[in-house]
């Protein structure tokens, strides 16, 4: 009842505030039999794979459908024009596609509350001169038709009349970034989050001029007759904001991609091609209920897939096991690649199982990896420290803030197990997450090339059914 009254109040307030753009209608709580969400494919928006669906917008859509207590139907489109047209024709209820707030969108749609913020940046290839001003461009800009980037360029053209650009309707943002990497086009414009994600696979991408700063990423609703859905969306957003869901999803999709190492990324991509094939079967065999790519990413962080690796502290092998750990899990030869992988998988699984049940499934791997790196006891110290600071001890985004404090006497003297190099654990986990994301991308590209199925670009408005509420949650493994 409280949620219902809150939704009505929000709806009435919203109607009063937007009378200049929205026709006045008597407010009626919005009733849906299913939530039809129009979207675009993209790693931070909506992706499907054998491991499940993912994406910031997708995860939020799942939660919103659960909040409304209706099934979710994701409806991907191939371009923005189709997406806008579908909303206009009432074929979808909402657009959730990583779209930024712009003057034109404010004029033609109702905008939901902010999910996260991005900058619009000029993107070019490594080796090209870095333009200091839009007038310094030594080539042509190519952008997606009907996108916010066209609006930005139109405004820039008023100050730079010679500025020209190409618009494409048959490409998406990821394809344009790939074309930059392949020297097929000179420049494009992209959201900073998209560049950060894609340079893990396309390390030659460079971010240049910041053309727009701190733009809100929002969902779009129809301009009229959407009071009910908008009020429910606002109530849902308020609930999830207070619950920390937005912070969690921000960390999940963007928290580990801000740090970038060009040389390391190039070396990792080469290792995937030349070294991984020798050991992939071992990772797949011994991963068990773990994703083999997470196990492989951990091994690369530990040893760069070198079975003879050793450190000054005495850890050795593909998974860099200590002698006591190897003995405990029944490994007799740490330099045998398969034995080391089997042992590392068993040890990592043990770390996951030791964690408190209060830690969500989607974050247990990151806590376990931190334990793998600095020890379970120090991670428990950090969790208790987080709780004393009124942070969430079960949220990785909060533990990331606390772990480096274990290096400061002011904090570690209060803990049971004392000093630990917590900042290294944060870097360790973030690196593995980046390696894992790259492995997933390469694996999906390989499967797509070998598949005889119709490519997504040849589809029109494919409807993807999603399990009913309660059967899937962002806190379940992807």
UniProtKB/Swiss-Prot annotation:
Reaction(s) this enzyme catalyzes, per UniProt: Exolytic cleavage of the (1->4)-beta-glycosidic linkage between N-acetylmuramic acid (MurNAc) and N-acetylglucosamine (GlcNAc) residues in peptidoglycan, from either the reducing or the non-reducing ends of the peptidoglycan chains, with concomitant formation of a 1,6-anhydrobond in the MurNAc residue
One annotated GO biological process: peptidoglycan catabolic process
Keyword tags: Cell outer membrane, Cell wall biogenesis/degradation, Lyase, Membrane, Signal
Cellular localisation: Cell outer membrane
Domain of life assignment: Bacteria
Enzyme class of the recorded protein, top EC level: lyase
Residue ranges, annotated region (LT domain): 258-478
Ranges for region Disordered: 447-478
Bilayer disposition of the protein: Peripheral membrane protein
UniProt cross-references to SMART domains, sorted A to Z: PBPb
InterPro entries registered for this protein in UniProt: Lysozyme-like_dom_sf, MltF, Solute-binding_3/MltF_N, Transglycosylase_SLT_dom_1
Region annotation Non-LT domain: where it falls in the sequence: 23-257
Signal peptide boundaries: 1-22
Protein EC: 4.2.2.n1
PROSITE patterns per the UniProt record, alphabetical: PROKAR_LIPOPROTEIN (PS51257)
Active site, UniProt feature: 302
GO cellular-component term (any): cell outer membrane
GO MF annotations in UniProt: peptidoglycan lytic transglycosylase activity
Domains as described in the record: The N-terminal domain does not have lytic activity and probably modulates enzymatic activity. The C-terminal domain is the catalytic active domain.
The family this protein is said to belong to: In the N-terminal section; belongs to the bacterial solute-binding protein 3 family.
Chain's role: Murein-degrading enzyme that degrades murein glycan strands and insoluble, high-molecular weight murein sacculi, with the concomitant formation of a 1,6-anhydromuramoyl product. Lytic transglycosylases (LTs) play an integral role in the metabolism of the peptidoglycan (PG) sacculus. Their lytic action creates space within the PG sacculus to allow for its expansion as well as for the insertion of various structures such as secretion systems and flagella.
NCBIfam families: PRK10859.1
Protein name (record): Membrane-bound lytic murein transglycosylase F
Organism of provenance: Shewanella oneidensis (strain ATCC 700550 / JCM 31522 / CIP 106686 / LMG 19005 / NCIMB 14063 / MR-1)
